[in-house]
């Protein structure tokens, strides 16, 4: 197995990702966005060659002290987007990446 920190690059923090985490808490955050769910969901940026079982193993080994169990992993490949740099004079692209939405079993959390 690869080093878990090579598979999981970092936690992905956006408004939508925080809403997914808030829906599992049942504390009123994100109430308008959707229904509450029993299983917490967290979003990570992962290696582009990582598979779903490899992502699950890496997360369980990184958070072994919290004894989390991964229920499911959904992956999304984000394509590079056109971007303008230097006041619109140069055109380029943003970097593409792969993100994983990980669902833990009920009662398991990393936060």
Swiss-Prot record:
It comes from the Bacteria. GO terms for biological process: translation. Signal peptide: none annotated. InterPro entries: Nucleotide-bd_a/b_plait_sf (IPR012677), Ribosomal_uL23-like (IPR013025), Ribosomal_uL23/eL15/eS24_sf (IPR012678). Coiled coil: none annotated. The keyword Nucleus does not apply. Keywords: Ribonucleoprotein, Ribosomal protein, RNA-binding, rRNA-binding. One of its GO terms (cellular component) is ribosome. GO terms for molecular function: rRNA binding; structural constituent of ribosome. NCBIfam families: PRK05738.2-2. HAMAP family: Ribosomal_uL23_B (MF_01369_B). Belongs to the universal ribosomal protein uL23 family. One of the early assembly proteins it binds 23S rRNA. One of the proteins that surrounds the polypeptide exit tunnel on the outside of the ribosome. Forms the main docking site for trigger factor binding to the ribosome. Part of the 50S ribosomal subunit. Contacts protein L29, and trigger factor when it is bound to the ribosome. This is Large ribosomal subunit protein uL23. It comes from Chlamydia abortus (strain DSM 27085 / S26/3). The lineage of its organism: Bacteria, Pseudomonadati, Chlamydiota, Chlamydiia, Chlamydiales. The gene is rplW.
């Amino acid at each position: 197995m690869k080093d878990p920190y090579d598979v999981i690059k970092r936690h992905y923090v956006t408004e939508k990702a925080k809403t997914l985490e808030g829906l599992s808490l049942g504390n009123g955050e994100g109430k308008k966005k959707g229904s509450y769910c029993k299983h917490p969901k967290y979003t990570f940026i992962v290696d582009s060659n990582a598979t779903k079982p490899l992502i699950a193993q890496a997360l369980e080994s990184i958070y072994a002290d919290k004894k989390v169990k991964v229920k499911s992993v959904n992956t999304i490949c984000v394509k590079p987007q056109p971007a303008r740099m230097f006041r619109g004079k140069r055109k380029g692209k943003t970097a593409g990446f792969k993100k994983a939405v990980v669902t833990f079993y009920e009662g398991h959390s990393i936060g």
